[in-house]
Each structure stands twice: as C-alpha cells, then as structure tokens.
A protein has these predicted regions:
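Alpha-helical elements of Rossmann-like donor-binding domains used by nucleotide-donor carbohydrate transfer enzymes
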Residues: 3-7, 91-95, 148-151, 168
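Conserved donor NDP-sugar-binding/catalytic core segment of glycosyltransferases
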Residues: 1-36, 102
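A short, conserved alpha-helix in the catalytic core of glycosyltransferases
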Residues: 61, 66-77, 82-109
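Active-site donor/metal-binding and catalytic loop motifs
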Residues: 102-130
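Non-catalytic, C-terminal membrane-associated alpha-helical segments of glycosyltransferases
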Residues: 124-188
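Donor-binding/catalytic cores of nucleotide-activated saccharide
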Residues: 26-58
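A recurrent flexible, glycine/aromatic-enriched loop bordering the glycosyltransferase active site
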Residues: 46-68, 134-137
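Structured catalytic cores of enzymes that bind and process phosphorylated ligands/cofactors
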Residues: 2, 6, 18-23, 45, ...
Length: 188
C-alpha cells in the first residue's frame, strides 16, 4: 500500500486513495475487489482495473483494503452513513475523485477474499426464474438493496437517477424487458 502511495504521490504530487487488491483464496489470479475505470458515466458502464505489477489509476474503488490519507479524511470526513451495506466505498472514492484526489489500485495483491459473487449473466438467469414476490425480497436484502442502489445513484450520478429508477422498476416487475434493454446498453 505504501509503495503505491509513493508512486501516486510521485505522479501527482498530492495525496491519493490507494485500494489494496484482494484475490480469491483458491485462485490468486482472480481479483475479487479493486478499482473500476468508467467507460460511460451516463450509461453506468465500466471495466475492472487489472493488476499489472504497478499501481493503476481508476475512477472508483472498493474499500475492502483502502488507504485514505489523513488530509483526505480532514477534507471529506468518513464514509456516508446512509447505506445499509453497499455503495459507501464507491460513493466515497468518487467524492474524493471529484475533489481532485487520484485513486489507484495496488500493482500486486494485498490480501485474500473468497470470490463469491455471481456474474451479471448468473444473476440475470436467477432473477428471470424468480417469482415477483421472490424478486421483491431479493431487492430488499441489504446486499442487493434498491434503497442503497438508488441512494448511491442520487448521490453519485443525479442525472442518471430517473432512468435508474425506471430500470430498477423494470428489473423487479418486467425482468425480461429490463434485460433486453440492458444488453443493448452493454453493446453501446
């Protein structure tokens, strides 16, 4: 973490947030968390930043392992407390970025974390098989919380908020239509 901090300071001559990259316990080549480079802010598309042996800049980052210099905390405070489970890390890192602080992931793994997340396709298949009642319960769960998701969008990308609200409504009530539209978005 500290060598990445020095790398970032040498590049920008200012404090940076450094996200330590955890890898899967059983597969050290599988990154479980890290940073994201945004491809299209309005559409909400991005790519996970990969470890290359040197720190990589990103647009938003997870906080499983996160080094935040004290001067950044003095300016931004700590994480927003309005979230149940998810999005506080993205929210904080994007707020830091907007204030001019660079974000980096480390060039090498800094820890282990089991990769237990579904791919987008796996989640799609699962949701399409669910009943309406099951989908509502799924999106009330803290890990998939509609409340957290919409709060995050409202705080990080307010121009997207009305579209994301419609998208979440479609994902719950008309998932087939939602995924058809989602695949078109992914191809843009």
């Amino acid at each position: 973490l500290f060598s990445s901090l020095e790398y970032a300071r040498g590049k920008y001559e200012k404090p940076a947030l450094i996200s330590g990259v955890p890898v899967d316990n059983n597969n050290p080549d599988a990154v479980t968390y890290g940073g994201v480079k945004i491809r299209n802010f309005f559409l909400g598309t991005g790519d996970r930043v990969q470890m290359t042996g040197v720190p990589q800049e990103c647009d938003k980052t997870h906080a499983n392992i996160l080094l935040v210099p004290a001067v950044v905390v003095d300016v931004l405070g700590i994480f927003y407390e309005g979230y149940q489970h998810a999005a506080a890390d993205y929210d904080y890192s994007m707020m830091a970025r907007r204030k001019g602080y660079p974000l980096f992931i480390t060039g090498h793994a800094c820890g282990y974390c089991e990769f237990d997340h579904e791919t987008g396709r796996q989640e799609e298949v699962k949701l399409l098989k669910m009943t309406l009642k099951e989908r509502k319960a799924y999106f009330r769960h803290p890990v998939h919380s509609t409340k957290d998701y919409l709060l995050a969008i409202r705080r990080m990308a307010p121009a997207r908020y009305p579209f994301v609200c419609v998208g979440r409504f479609l994902n719950i009530y008309c998932p087939q239509l939602y995924y058809k539209l989602s695949h078109v978005r992914d191809d843009l």
